[in-house]
Curated annotation (Swiss-Prot):
GO terms for molecular function: acylglycerol O-acyltransferase activity; calcium-independent phospholipase A2 activity; O-acyltransferase activity; phospholipase A1 activity; zinc ion binding. It catalyses: a 1,2-diacyl-sn-glycero-3-phosphocholine + H2O = a 2-acyl-sn-glycero-3-phosphocholine + a fatty acid + H(+); 1,2-dihexadecanoyl-sn-glycero-3-phosphocholine + H2O = 2-hexadecanoyl-sn-glycero-3-phosphocholine + hexadecanoate + H(+); 1-hexadecanoyl-2-(9Z-octadecenoyl)-sn-glycero-3-phosphocholine + H2O = 2-(9Z-octadecenoyl)-sn-glycero-3-phosphocholine + hexadecanoate + H(+); 1,2-di-(9Z-octadecenoyl)-sn-glycero-3-phosphocholine + H2O = 2-(9Z-octadecenoyl)-sn-glycero-3-phosphocholine + (9Z)-octadecenoate + H(+). Zn(2+) binds at residues 198, 355, 392. This is Lysosomal phospholipase A and acyltransferase. The gene is Pla2g15. Disulfide bonds join 65-89. Belongs to the AB hydrolase superfamily. Lipase family. Its main location: other. Substrate binds at residues 46, 199. GO terms for biological process: ceramide metabolic process; diacylglycerol biosynthetic process; fatty acid metabolic process; glycerophospholipid metabolic process; phosphatidylcholine catabolic process; phosphatidylcholine metabolic process; phosphatidylethanolamine catabolic process; phosphatidylglycerol metabolic process. Residues 1-33 form the signal peptide.
C-alpha cells in the first residue's frame, strides 16, 4: 500500500479517536461556571428602596383618602401621594406607631406594608416604579455592573428592607440576607462583595458584628461602604425638631415631621459619643442648648418623648469599637456644605439657621471617618477613598466610585 495513503489513514484514525475526546473537553469547559467575578449584594440606605402597602382601614384622616385597596400599591416612592391634602393620607399610612410596653413599632390599624423585590435590583434602582429620573438611585451603578458582565437578579442582587425600622425590628431580613449570601456563594463559586450606601452600612455592620469570623471569612470577600454614617448624623436633630422636606417645595417640614419622627431609624442615627465631643452643641435655642448628653431633655422639649425610648432601644445596636471583620473599603464625599449645627429663634416649630461643616451634604466628615479607627483593630485591610465634591446620593454614580468598585470586583490594577 502507498505509504502516503497509510499515513493519511493513520491520521484519520487518530482524528476519529481524538474528536470525541476533544468534544468532551469542550463540553466540560462549557459546563464550568463562566463566573470570573464575585457576586454582589447591594444594600440601600434610608428611604432607599420601594415600599408597598395594602389598606383596610377603620377610618381615614380625610375624605379623599382611600380606606380600602384590593391589592398592594406603591407607598414609597409615589410622587402623586406627596401632593397637598393627599400627603395627609400618605403620612397616615407610612407612619409607625411606637409601643412603649413592647418597645417595638406597629403599622397603623388597617395598613399592611411590605418590601418588594428582595433579591432583585428594581426596587432600589428606581424608587419610583415609573422610573422617573427624580427617583433614580442605584440605576447607574447597576447598569455599570451589567456592562462589566453581571446579570440583574443573578450575580448582582438587591437587599431592600423596611428602612423605617432599626435592625432590632428587622430580624427576618437578616436571616433572608444570610441565606441569599450563602446561596450566591454556592451558585457562583466564591464569596460575596457587599456594597452598601448610607444607613445600609449601619445595617451591614450590625449584621457582620453578629456573624462568626469563620462565616465572614468564607462568605464575604469585601465590604464596599459608600457615605456611611458610622457616628450618626448632625442633621438628624433638625429632622426630629422641625422636620426636613429635603428641599421639596410642595412638602411642608412640619407636615413631614410626624412621619420622620415615627421612624425609629431616625433616632438611631443621632450623633454618637464615640465620634463627637460631649461638649459640641448641635442645637442652639434662646432658652437652652443641646449636646449629645442632652437627648432626653431634647426629646422632652420637642414634645416627642417616644423618641427617647427609641434612642435607648437602638443606641447599642452596633459596637463602635468592633470592626466588621472583613476587607473594608470606605468611600466618602468631602467639600460639600453639610449641616453641622442649628440655631433656632422659635424652637422647635420654625426652620433653623444652619451652620455647615465638611462632608457630603448629609453625612458629616467626622462620622464617616470612624472607619479609620478600625485599621488597627482588624487583620483585614481597611482602605479609605475620598471623593472630593461628591454629594451623598450622587456618589453612587460618581465616576471615581464606579472605577474604584470595578477594581475591587475585577481586581484590575
Amino acid at each position: 500500500m502507498d505509504r502516503h495513503l497509510c499515513i493519511c489513514r493513520e491520521i484519520q484514525l487518530r482524528s476519529g479517536l481524538l474528536f470525541p475526546f476533544l468534544l468532551l473537553m469542550m463540553l466540560a469547559d462549557l459546563a464550568l461556571p463562566a463566573q470570573r467575578h464575585p457576586p454582589v449584594v447591594l444594600v440601600p440606605g434610608d428611604l432607599g428602596n420601594q415600599l408597598e402597602a395594602k389598606l383596610d382601614k377603620p377610618k381615614v384622616v380625610h375624605y379623599l383618602c382611600s380606606k380600602r385597596t384590593d391589592s398592594y400599591f406603591t407607598l414609597w416612592l409615589n410622587l402623586e401621594l406627596l401632593l397637598p391634602v393627599i400627603i395627609d393620607c400618605w403620612i397616615d399610612n407610612i407612619r409607625l406607631v411606637y409601643n412603649r410596653t413592647s418597645r417595638t413599632t406597629q403599622f397603623p390599624d388597617g395598613v399592611d406594608v411590605r418590601v418588594p423585590g428582595f433579591g432583585e435590583t428594581f426596587s432600589l434602582e428606581f424608587l419610583d416604579p415609573s422610573k422617573r429620573n427624580v427617583g433614580s438611585y442605584f440605576y447607574t451603578m447597576v447598569e455599570s455592573l451589567v456592562g462589566w458582565g453581571y446579570t440583574r437578579g443573578e450575580d448582582v442582587r438587591g437587599a431592600p428592607y423596611d428602612w423605617r425600622r432599626a435592625p432590632n425590628e428587622n430580624g427576618p431580613y437578616f436571616l433572608a440576607l444570610q441565606e441569599m449570601i450563602e446561596e450566591m456563594y454556592q451558585m457562583y463559586g466564591g464569596p460575596v462583595v457587599l456594597v452598601a450606601h448610607s444607613m445600609g452600612n449601619m445595617y451591614m455592620l450590625y449584621f457582620l458584628q453578629r456573624q462568626p469570623q469563620a462565616w465572614k471569612d468564607k462568605y464575604i470577600q469585601a465590604f464596599v461602604s459608600l457615605g456611611a454614617p458610622w457616628g450618626g448624623v448632625a442633621k438628624t436633630l433638625r429632622v426630629l425638631a422641625s422636620g426636613d422636606n429635603n428641599r421639596i417645595p410642595v412638602i411642608g417640614p412640619l407636615k413631614i415631621r410626624e412621619q420622620q419622627r415615627s421612624a425609629v431609624s431616625t433616632s438611631w442615627l443621632l450623633p454618637y459619643n464615640h465620634t463627637w465631643s460631649h461638649e459640641k452643641v448641635f442645637v442652639y435655642t434662646p432658652t437652652a442648648n443641646y449636646t449629645l448628653r442632652d437627648y432626653h431633655r431634647f426629646f422632652q422639649d420637642i414634645g416627642f418623648e417616644d423618641g427617647w425610648f427609641m434612642r435607648q432601644d437602638t443606641q447599642g445596636l452596633v459596637e463602635a469599637l468592633v470592626p466588621p471583620g472583613v476587607e473594608l473599603h470606605c468611600l466618602y464625599g468631602t467639600g460639600v456644605p453639610t449641616p453641622n449645627s442649628f440655631y433656632y429663634e422659635n424652637f422647635p416649630d420654625r426652620d433653623p439657621k444652619i451652620c455647615f461643616g465638611d462632608g457630603d451634604g448629609t453625612v458629616n466628615l467626622e462620622s464617616v471617618l470612624q472607619c479609620q479607627a478600625w485599621q488597627s483593630r482588624q487583620e483585614h485591610k481597611v482602605s479609605l477613598q475620598e471623593l472630593p465634591g461628591s454629594e451623598h446620593i450622587e456618589m453612587l454614580a460618581n465616576a471615581t466610585t464606579l472605577a474604584y468598585l470595578k477594581r475591587v470586583l475585577l481586581e484590575e490594577p
